[in-house]
């Protein structure tokens, strides 16, 4: 059995770790509220844009934007993968990467190749390690990212699709459902899909000023950017929620471990006292 001093040292070490996990839990709880507010503010805009683009996809126009054109053969797939920069978030990133690898292998089994861009340090490190072709990467955007910081990697994928170097583009991120549940999501970005609402079967006629090509070029690009930005906010909220839950679990486990070690310490101390008493009694008897 370990000595009382060793057990006391272990208890002190676990207590120090518990202080860290409790602090991280409190910080994440504070940050998640802000992340949820940012997410809620941007959602209506993204949803309205999605509905409008869905209608434009079915509109009667002589100009058909490249983002609306589905390629005949799917030989190369692009993914925009969003992860966190930091760890200590439970299985949030690993679950996303595991599902991503499953999707990639399905396409590769069908003869398609895969290119990705990564947003977040964890995704960049993971996919570089397994030798996936990375077209672009951006990291360390913080808890309040700006759209301008994402435009570069988004443009890489949009240009590749326009030039027919990619046949489909997907957005991969953690969708925030609630504090306890975050779901790995795969949304098709390109080609853009038609609206699925109850009016989707109508033909929509639009008047474009100055012309359809100019308007659609700006609208389509802005729409894709808004989707990626919204996904980024969803992922940030998911990260803080997962970290808060993980740190609470770590704190709870620390409490249990401290209780167990304290019990071991008490038994060791009791055994030592019993031993000393036995020695004293034995010595007195010998005298």
From Swiss-Prot:
Recorded GO molecular functions are: ATP binding; proton-transporting ATP synthase activity, rotational mechanism
User: Per the UniProt entry, what are the Gene Ontology biological process annotations, in alphabetical order?
Assistant: proton motive force-driven plasma membrane ATP synthesis
Q: Which CDD domains match?
A: F1-ATPase_gamma
UniProt keyword annotation of Cell inner membrane present? yes
Q: Can you name a GO cellular component term? A: plasma membrane
- Report the Gene3D superfamilies cross-referenced here: 3.40.1380.10, ATP synthase, gamma subunit, helix hairpin domain (1.10.287.80)
InterPro entries from the UniProt entry: ATP_synth_F1_ATPase_gsu (IPR035968), ATP_synth_F1_gsu (IPR000131), ATP_synth_F1_gsu_CS (IPR023632)
- Which NCBIfam families has this protein been placed in? ATPsyn_F1gamma, PRK05621.1-1
Q: How does it assemble?
A: F-type ATPases have 2 components, CF(1) - the catalytic core - and CF(0) - the membrane proton channel. CF(1) has five subunits: alpha(3), beta(3), gamma(1), delta(1), epsilon(1). CF(0) has three main subunits: a, b and c.
Q: What does this protein do?
A: Produces ATP from ADP in the presence of a proton gradient across the membrane. The gamma chain is believed to be important in regulating ATPase activity and the flow of protons through the CF(0) complex.
Q: Which PANTHER family match?
A: ATP SYNTHASE GAMMA CHAIN, ATP SYNTHASE SUBUNIT GAMMA, MITOCHONDRIAL
User: What protein does this entry describe?
Assistant: ATP synthase gamma chain
Q: Which organism is it from?
A: Xylella fastidiosa (strain Temecula1 / ATCC 700964)
């Amino acid at each position: 059995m370990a000595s009382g001093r060793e057990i006391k040292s272990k208890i002190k070490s676990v207590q120090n770790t518990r202080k860290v996990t409790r602090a991280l839990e409190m910080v994440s709880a504070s940050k998640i509220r802000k992340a949820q507010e940012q997410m809620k503010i941007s959602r209506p805009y993204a949803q309205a844009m999605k509905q409008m683009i869905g209608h434009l996809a079915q509109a009667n126009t002589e100009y058909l934007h490249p983002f609306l054109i589905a390629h005949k053969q799917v030989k190369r797939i692009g993914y925009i993968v969003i992860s966190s920069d930091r760890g200590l978030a439970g299985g949030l990133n690993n679950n996303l990467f595991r599902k991503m690898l499953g999707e990639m292998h399905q396409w590769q089994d069908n003869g398609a190749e895969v290119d990705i861009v990564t947003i977040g340090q964890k995704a960049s490190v993971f996919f570089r390690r397994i030798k996936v072709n990375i077209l672009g990467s951006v990291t360390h955007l913080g808890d309040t990212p700006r759209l301008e910081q994402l435009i570069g990697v988004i443009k890489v994928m949009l240009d590749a699709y326009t030039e027919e170097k990619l046949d489909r583009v997907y957005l991969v991120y953690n969708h925030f459902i609630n504090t306890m549940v975050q779901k790995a999501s795969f949304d098709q970005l390109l080609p853009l899909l038609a609206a699925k609402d109850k009016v989707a079967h109508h033909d929509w006629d639009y008047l474009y000023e100055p012309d359809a090509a100019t308007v659609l070029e700006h609208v389509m690009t802005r729409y894709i950017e808004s989707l990626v930005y919204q996904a980024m906010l969803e992922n940030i909220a998911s990260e803080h929620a997962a970290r808060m839950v993980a740190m609470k679990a770590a704190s709870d486990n620390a409490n249990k471990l401290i209780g167990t070690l304290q019990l071991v310490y008490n038994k060791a101390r009791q055994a030592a006292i019993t031993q000393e008493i036995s020695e004293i009694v034995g010595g007195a008897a010998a005298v």
